[in-house]
Amino acid sequence: NLYQFKNMIHCTVPSRPWWHFADYGCYCGRGGKGTPVDDLDRCCQVHDNCYEKAGKMGCWPYLTLYKYKCSQGKLTCSGGNSKCGAAVCNCDLVAANCFAGARYIDANYNINFKKRCQ
């Protein structure tokens, strides 16, 4: 669920508050459209698409609980998750790892969505 995703982000990117990823580019946060502004925004676009796919499986990605571990910045999803738990955990794990490898550009935080995301 979103609370667990927030904690995953903190695991892989402890140096930056999670809310910096909640209003970034065209895809991090409020849904998304248009062309991603950078690699970090592409991480969010992939995450959105992953959640959409999980939804088509009958899952509720924003609410689905799952089990995972964080150890020294490394995430693993537990093997005992339900079908939906496994799918959503994987979506969140891939995104959190992607965030860790992408450059954060301050100018792409809280951008003018109407102008830049068409």
UniProtKB/Swiss-Prot annotation:
Its cofactor is Ca(2+). A motif (Coagulation factor Xa binding motif) lies at residues 52-69. Its EC number is 3.1.1.4. It comes from the Eukaryota. Keywords: Blood coagulation cascade inhibiting toxin, Calcium, Disulfide bond, Hemostasis impairing toxin, Hydrolase, Lipid degradation, Lipid metabolism, Metal-binding, Secreted, Toxin. SMART domains: PA2c (SM00085). The keyword Disulfide bond applies. It holds the Pfam family Phospholip_A2_1. Binds 1 Ca(2+) ion. PANTHER family: PHOSPHOLIPASE A2 A2-ACTITOXIN-UCS2A-LIKE, PHOSPHOLIPASE A2 FAMILY MEMBER. Belongs to the phospholipase A2 family. Group I subfamily. D49 sub-subfamily. This is Phospholipase A2 'basic'. It comes from Naja nigricollis.
